[in-house]
């Protein structure tokens, strides 16, 4: 009847408003770099030489967000610039103005890197972390430098078995965001691999909400 139709319409309108509000909040968090260190926030907001952060430049499908965030850790906040000279100028400015600390990746320098990890075999289990990333070619050398020895596994038991078989040649990260690095160090606990606290998850959720909002 008409009452039921009106009620359903009201629910749809309310749901749309909720989605729009959530999307706006997430977009603001992305733009203001909420969750970044103060130095990185300053650089990304004020420096023309800054091309964005690493988190801005990579896309990861939802099943792998926790794993990639755990593998990259604070490197997600890396500020990207082209030249080493720009990186030095940015850091000098932060020091002079006492505006915090930041880590800067100079893409030109990284592109000339020759020390690529070249194991003689692959681990007995795991998916290369690089295979779940979408990233522009210009940023791929940096992604390789950070993740070329990292493999995604189901759990720490599988990570341990693969680590032993390879005698510590690789880093492993689980879908839940736990890690076992090449030194044999385990790291785990509560992870934020989705939602507003996740630097990668925010963008995924915004994309999903945009689809729902039409």
Describe the role of every protein-language-model region.
Residues 11, 17-214:
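Hinge-like oligomerization/junction regions that interrupt long coiled-coil arms in large cytoskeletal
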């Amino acid at each position: 009847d008409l009452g039921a139709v009106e009620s359903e319409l009201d629910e749809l309108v309310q749901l749309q408003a909720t989605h729009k509000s959530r999307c706006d909040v997430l977009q603001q968090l992305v733009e203001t770099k909420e969750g970044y260190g103060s130095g990185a926030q300053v650089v990304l907001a004020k420096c023309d030489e800054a091309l964005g952060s690493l988190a801005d430049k990579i896309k990861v499908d939802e099943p792998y967000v926790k794993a990639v965030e755990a593998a990259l850790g604070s490197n997600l906040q890396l500020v990207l610039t082209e030249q080493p000279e720009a990186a030095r100028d940015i850091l000098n400015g932060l020091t002079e103005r006492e505006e915090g600390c930041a880590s800067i990746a100079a893409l030109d320098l990284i592109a000339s890197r020759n020390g690529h990890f070249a194991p003689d075999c692959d681990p007995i289990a795991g998916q290369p972390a690089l295979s779940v990333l979408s990233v522009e070619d210009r940023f791929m050398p940096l992604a390789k430098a950070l993740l070329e020895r990292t493999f995604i596994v189901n759990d720490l038991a599988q990570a341990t078995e693969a680590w032993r078989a390879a005698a510590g040649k690789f880093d492993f990260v689980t879908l839940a965001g736990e890690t076992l690095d090449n030194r044999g160090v385990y790291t785990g606990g509560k992870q934020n691999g989705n939602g507003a606290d996740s630097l990668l998850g925010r963008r995924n959720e915004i994309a999903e909400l945009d689809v729902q909002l039409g």
